[in-house]
A protein has these predicted regions:
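Extended repeat-based interaction scaffolds and adjacent low-complexity, acidic/S/T/P-biased segments
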Residues: 1-175
Length: 175
C-alpha cells in the first residue's frame, strides 16, 4: 500500500492512465495491460485514502479534493463494477471521517450527492450537522466553500439547504 504522501501522485496517475485508456480505445491500441494497472491503482487508492486524508491541512485538503472528485467520471466504464463500487464505498467512508479539512469534507459531501451515493435527505442532514454550533466557524466556512464548489446551484434547487445556510449566517456574531 502506498504511503500517505504518495496518494496525490497515485490519484494523478489514475487520471493519466484513464485518459490514456480512453485515447487508446479510440485508436484501437491494445490496452489490456493498462486496464489491469488502472484496476490495481484504483484499489490501492481505495485502501490508502482514508488514512491519507485524516489530519491533512487546508492546502492538502484542496489538493485531495481536486484529485478525488473527478476520478469517478474518469474511471467510469474502464474498471470492473466491483472496483467502481469499491471506489464509491471509499467515498462514503471518507464522509464519516472527522479529522479532515472542511473544504475536502464539503467537496466530498457534494460529490456524494451529485453521484447519488447519498439521498437528498442525507445531503440536507449532513449540511445541517455541519452548520451546527459545535463546529468552528472557519471549518464550517471552508466546508461550505468546498460543498458549493464553483457553483451555488445546490442552494437554488434545495430550499432546505438555503434555509439552513441562511439561518447559520444570520446567527453569526457581527464582527
Amino acid at each position: 500500500v502506498a504511503i500517505a504522501s504518495d496518494i496525490p501522485e497515485l490519484l494523478s496517475g489514475i487520471s493519466a492512465i484513464a485518459t490514456t485508456l480512453r485515447i487508446g480505445a479510440t485508436r484501437r491500441m491494445d490496452t489490456f495491460s493498462l486496464a489491469d494497472i488502472l484496476e490495481r491503482m484504483v484499489k490501492r487508492a481505495c485502501l490508502a485514502l482514508p488514512n491519507a486524508v485524516v489530519g491533512t491541512n487546508d492546502t492538502e485538503g484542496e489538493r485531495f479534493a481536486s484529485a478525488i472528485v473527478p476520478i469517478a467520471h474518469q474511471i467510469e466504464g474502464l474498471v470492473s463494477e466491483e472496483t467502481s463500487q469499491h471506489w464509491e464505498a471509499t467515498i462514503l467512508v471518507l464522509l464519516r471521517l472527522k479529522a479532515m479539512p472542511g473544504f475536502l469534507a464539503g467537496r466530498l459531501q457534494r460529490h456524494a450527492g451529485d453521484q447519488k451515493l447519498v439521498s437528498e435527505l442525507e445531503q440536507e442532514q449532513a449540511f445541517a450537522r455541519t452548520l451546527s454550533p459545535g463546529n468552528s466557524h472557519a471549518w464550517v466556512a471552508a466546508w461550505v466553500q468546498g460543498f458549493l464548489g464553483e457553483s451555488g446551484l445546490a442552494l437554488i434547487y434545495s430550499d432546505e439547504l438555503f434555509r439552513t445556510l441562511d439561518t447559520w449566517i444570520t446567527g453569526l456574531d457581527p464582527i
